């Protein structure tokens, strides 16, 4: 039975390797070095078929065969041994190697292009030249060209007075600062009229071409080439007239002298005519009438002449144009001045690169090079013009400010300044975004960057979405800060209804709260903006927590300063403008922060004292002031007379209305409060308004001196007693005299 099963598997396995079933993939792979089993012959197949029939005919053998087949089917296949394939090592190239490779690639392509051009010129067949056909085609072509140029020149000459009136009216209106938009509108209007005249000329040219082609498709094709070149070149010349405006100086958007404007307009027009009519008209006609390779050679000669001439014009006028650009930058806004100065340094290299790239493009792709370069140039000029106009609008708006009503300015002193600051920042940001978009559009115009594809893909959409969300975050943060700060400033200011100013304590607390609010809003805004950009702020928060813990251990004095300062403020210990004594220092509080207090002495010295170093302090502006005046009188004087003189001085002082308004209540006479060997002391005390005790004391001293002199009350003087030595002869006593000071 087993040999029958073996033969059966051989018969079933042999065709299985030779037949491929569509849609079914095999998972078992065999080594390529294993040789396939030999194909059984016909006799072996017949014997196997007969044996299989005998097996199936017997119930016992058939059952045994079925069991063996199920056993084989249930046996899992052996897992294939994985092959270890070493990874492919890719050697990274340096920047120098990449530049060398790119240079070699384009150098070989350029060399092959010149070689192919040489082989085509020397080995290609030439078409026979038919003078009669050429003369006929040239006649019809020249007639169309003369009529089209003549018609276009005539209608532009008729429109010249209109241009001049538009320019004069716009310049007159532009003298008024509020009518600055009229001049740009007239410049754009003149450009649109120029394009309409060009469209009219093309329509007339097409009508003339239909009647001047002599029924020849070749002549019609050549005339269509001329009309296409005429449309493209004259459109470029219209752009040149928009920039230089050689015939109507009033419509010239830039400060350029008439001679320079005519010089550059004329030469750039000649250059564009050489390129356009040479590549679009002359080269195709030569290729059609003579030979394609001769047309390619003509293309190379035309572009080489154009490139050499353009480079000559660029470097011949380099210094003059650079100086004009620098002078123009001096009279421009600061934002535009930066770009103009940068452009003045590199304009000749950019212009040279432009014509060199055009030359090489014409070699590699003669049919589309001029179309691409002209299209990219026009788009670039349009992008730069629109970007300059939009940026100029933003710059003019920057010069303007928002002016609030006097009532609003009185209630919210900093609101106008803050609104103008936000508006200025928003306009500057919009101006920078305008420049960035203009740069990307310029790169897209030259095929270096696909701006619209980038904008539609994930990266561009994500960038725009992030910018919009950041703008909204900054907008709401600015609005929130402006509202809260304005409310605080409104509380700090008085209104037209005579609302009194808040106390010094309230002003100090509100100022500290405003500063803390600014820090909190700024921190939250920065964190949210970083999160929107894509920065994971979780490590920043964790790092800030760890850093804060580390700082807390190393900056206990700072924490003590803050806590002590907060409690002193809540207890209304001192405020800005108070006269205080802190330790050995006495002065006026000029500044209070969350960490320290600034005190200025009467000598002008300014001291910064940390809150934590203050253990006790005295405030002279709390409730009342006090004057305790002690006056020493010679003990030989009559006490009643001296006391009466002091009362007379106080009575005269109280009659002074200015001084009387500073005194609270009545003076207190204490009489004699001290007695010494040479004097006795009289005392009088006053209760005054805060910080007015020195004014009262100075006035009192003046009155006391006056009344003591009138009453003959003497101040105490120091006396000496001379005693003779023991055994000495006593001297004659001196006559008594007045004591001397």
Curated annotation (Swiss-Prot):
Signal peptide: 1-18
Protein name stated in the entry: Moderate conductance mechanosensitive channel YbiO
Protein location: Cell inner membrane
Protein purpose: Mechanosensitive channel that protects cells against hypoosmotic stress when highly overexpressed.
Region (Disordered): 22-42
UniProt membrane topology term: Multi-pass membrane protein
Gene3D superfamilies documented for this protein: 1.10.287.1260, 2.30.30.60, 3.30.70.100
Keywords tagged on the record: Cell inner membrane, Cell membrane, Ion channel, Ion transport, Membrane, Signal, Transmembrane, Transmembrane helix, Transport
GO biological process: cellular response to osmotic stress
Quaternary data: Homoheptamer.
UniProt feature coiled coil, ranges: none
Molecular function (Gene Ontology), one example: mechanosensitive monoatomic ion channel activity
Family from the record: Belongs to the MscS (TC 1.A.23) family.
Bias (Low complexity) ranges: 25-34
Transmembrane segments: 143-163, 185-205, 225-245, 268-288, 294-314, 343-363, 372-392, 432-452, 466-486, 509-529, 533-553
Listed InterPro entries: LSM_dom_sf (IPR010920), MS_channel_1st (IPR049142), MS_channel_C (IPR049278), MscS_beta-dom_sf (IPR023408), MscS_channel_2nd (IPR006685), MscS_channel_C_sf (IPR011066), MscS_channel_TM-2 (IPR011014), YbiO_bact (IPR045276)
Predominant location: membrane
Gene of this entry: ybiO
Induction (free text): Induced by NaCl and RpoS.
Listed PANTHER family: MODERATE CONDUCTANCE MECHANOSENSITIVE CHANNEL YBIO
Gene Ontology cellular component list: plasma membrane
